[in-house]
A protein has these predicted regions:
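The Walker A/P-loop phosphate-binding site
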Residues: 159-168
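A generic structural motif
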Residues: 119-128
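Acidic, metal-coordinating catalytic cores used for nucleic-acid/nucleotide bond scission
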Residues: 53, 73-76, 98-108
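Short, surface-exposed amphipathic charged segments that create phosphate/polyanion-binding patches used
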Residues: 81-89, 129-144
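Phosphate-handling DNA/RNA-contact segment within nucleic-acid enzymes
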Residues: 1-92
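Short, aromatic/basic amphipathic alpha-helical patches
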Residues: 106-116
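Interdomain "pre-motor" coupling segment immediately N-terminal to P-loop NTPase/helicase cores
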Residues: 151-160
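Conserved RecA-like P-loop NTPase ATPase core
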Residues: 58, 96, 168
């Protein structure tokens, strides 16, 4: 078996492999918008995060339609979402709730480019890396405020450190 993914967190490293016809991996929790399971004709809001833990945080905050890209910020979006395009067509707005680090900001830009005008972007407090940190630091009401205050933003307005490297 070939290692297809690796996740590092405080104090441990998790490796996994996959021998499956679903390579690349589907987005985590994508079945939440499966047309066979959803009674609504249109899903008003789907939230996309960078990690599974963030999806669980959003579910806890009352947002059932939340998914995570399958391989974090390094995900190949076209391969990951291609099979689910018919499912994604039933989604009106896509809230992108990315991490605040450089890979997370880059992922936000890529997701915005990929999904286009229906994207809304969140803004996290400066001392939080992701929405799970917001829950731990500020509580569930602030998580809800962040999601409810998501706004459209042009991808040209999203700047990463790499794009400003020459000016530093």
């Amino acid at each position: 078996r070939e290692t297809t993914g690796m996740k590092k967190a405080a104090g441990y490293t998790k490796f996994w492999s996959q021998d499956s016809p679903t390579t690349p991996c589907p987005p985590y929790h994508i079945d939440c918008i499966n047309p066979l399971k959803v009674s609504e004709a249109t899903i008003p809001r789907l939230i996309i995060t960078e990690g599974e833990k963030d999806v669980l945080t959003l579910n806890e905050a009352g947002y059932p339609y939340a998914i995570s890209v399958p391989n974090g910020a390094a995900s190949d979006l076209s391969k990951s979402f291609e099979a689910f395009e018919p499912w994604m067509e039933q989604v009106r707005d896509i809230v992108i709730c990315g991490d605040s680090d450089l890979p997370g900001r880059t992922l936000v830009k890529h997701l915005s480019d990929y999904f286009g005008a229906r994207c809304l972007l969140t803004t996290l407090p400066g001392d939080c890396k992701d929405i799970s940190d917001v829950l731990a630091t500020y509580g569930i009401e602030i998580v809800r405020e962040i999601i409810e205050s998501a706004r459209p933003q042009h991808t040209a307005d999203i700047v990463t450190v790499g794009e400003r490297a020459n000016g530093i």
